Structure formats: structure tokens, C-alpha cells
């Protein structure tokens, strides 16, 4: 009957320590720091060192009993005559300008001429287009055939807009009022 007090928690034939002793060895982080979840190491493997969380200073843990303490990596001095300055990698930045051709409309625009490759502001002129002819035909249909049908030819807001280069005088674009393009 004296064997009733034997600890039945045996691992590899060796009695294990009671759970109360394991709880006393557990250390808590100082106040103000979140508690990191720690897992018990598996048998046969040394405990792993996890990197500290960003934003918090690294914590020093006392060495655990029964495991050899790891040595920090050995640092070697620089060879004699070698520069002692740290190596700074430089990154070359290539800037590529992308020029987006502006949308041609009713007003002059700043652009690069596709013919003479100069940067300039376009010269605009008004030309009779499909909108002028449509309004003229509609006026004739409604009975304004005695000269009133010619009024749309004098209204610039109904005419197409032609954009020309101010240097080489070549036509760059024609804005069509009917299609809006």
C-alpha cells in the first residue's frame, strides 16, 4: 500500500516534476508589454527562440536548466588595411517622363507637335462641319428657306474647331461638334 503515493506521470521511465513546480518557473513579461504565448518544448528538442515583436525591446530570458546555452556567433576583425567604413548600397533611380497628349476640345491646348516636335499652344480656327449643315437643313424643313437657313454658318459655337501648330502651321486635330470628339 505504500506505493499509492508514487507519481504516475512518468516520461521515459523518469518521474516528472509536479505541475506546481512548472507553474512557478513560468515568468511573466513586465507590465506594459503584451503577454506572448509560450508553448512547452517537445521532448528531445531544445526550445526555440522566437524573434521579439516589432515595436518592443527584446527581452532577455534566463537559461533553462538541462539545456546547453547557445553561444552568440563569433565576429572576426576586418583584415589589416581594409577600410573600416560600412558598405552603403546605392540605388540608381531612372526617371522616365511620360507625356500624355491632352484632350483636344473647343479651347487651345498645350501639347507637343507631332510634326515638328516642339512644345507649344495650339491655334484654333472654326470650320463649318456637320452640326452647321444639320441645323441649316432643319431650318429649311421648318420653313426658314429665305436666307434664315444660312444663320448657322455665322455661329462659331456650331462650327467644328481645328487645332493647328503655332510653329509649323500644320493641322493637329479637328474637334467635331456633332460627335463630341
Swiss-Prot record:
InterPro entries: LITAF (IPR006629), LITAF_fam (IPR037519). GO terms for molecular function: zinc ion binding. One of its GO terms (biological process) is response to bacterium. The keyword Zinc applies. Keywords: Endosome, Lysosome, Membrane, Metal-binding, Zinc. Residues 131-151 are annotated as: Membrane-binding amphipathic helix. The keyword Ribonucleoprotein does not apply. GO terms for cellular component: late endosome membrane; lysosomal membrane. Residues 90-177 form the LITAF domain. Residues 13-69 have a biased composition (Low complexity). Residues 1-82 are annotated as: Disordered. Zn(2+) binds at residues 113, 116, 165, 168. It is a peripheral membrane protein. It is found in: Late endosome membrane; Lysosome membrane. Belongs to the CDIP1/LITAF family. The LITAF domain is stabilized by a bound zinc ion. The LITAF domain contains an amphipathic helix that mediates interaction with lipid membranes. This is Cell death-inducing p53-target protein 1 homolog. The gene is litaf.
Amino acid at each position: 500500500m505504500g506505493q499509492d503515493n508514487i507519481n504516475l506521470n512518468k516520461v521515459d521511465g523518469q518521474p516528472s516534476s509536479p505541475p506546481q513546480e512548472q507553474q512557478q518557473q513560468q515568468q511573466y513579461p513586465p507590465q506594459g508589454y503584451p503577454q506572448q504565448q509560450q508553448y512547452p518544448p517537445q521532448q528531445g528538442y531544445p526550445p526555440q527562440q522566437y524573434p521579439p515583436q516589432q515595436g518592443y525591446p527584446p527581452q532577455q530570458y534566463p537559461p533553462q536548466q538541462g539545456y546547453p546555452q547557445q553561444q552568440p556567433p563569433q565576429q572576426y576583425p576586418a583584415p589589416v588595411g581594409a577600410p573600416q567604413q560600412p558598405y552603403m548600397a546605392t540605388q540608381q533611380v531612372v526617371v522616365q517622363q511620360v507625356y500624355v497628349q491632352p484632350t483636344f476640345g473647343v479651347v487651345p491646348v498645350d501639347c507637343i507637335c507631332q510634326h515638328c516636335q516642339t512644345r507649344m499652344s495650339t491655334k484654333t480656327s472654326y470650320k463649318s462641319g456637320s452640326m452647321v449643315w444639320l441645323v441649316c437643313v432643319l431650318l429649311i424643313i421648318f420653313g426658314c428657306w429665305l436666307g434664315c437657313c444660312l444663320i448657322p454658318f455665322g455661329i462659331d459655337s456650331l462650327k467644328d474647331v481645328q487645332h493647328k501648330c503655332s510653329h509649323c502651321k500644320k493641322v493637329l486635330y479637328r474637334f467635331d461638334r456633332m460627335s463630341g470628339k
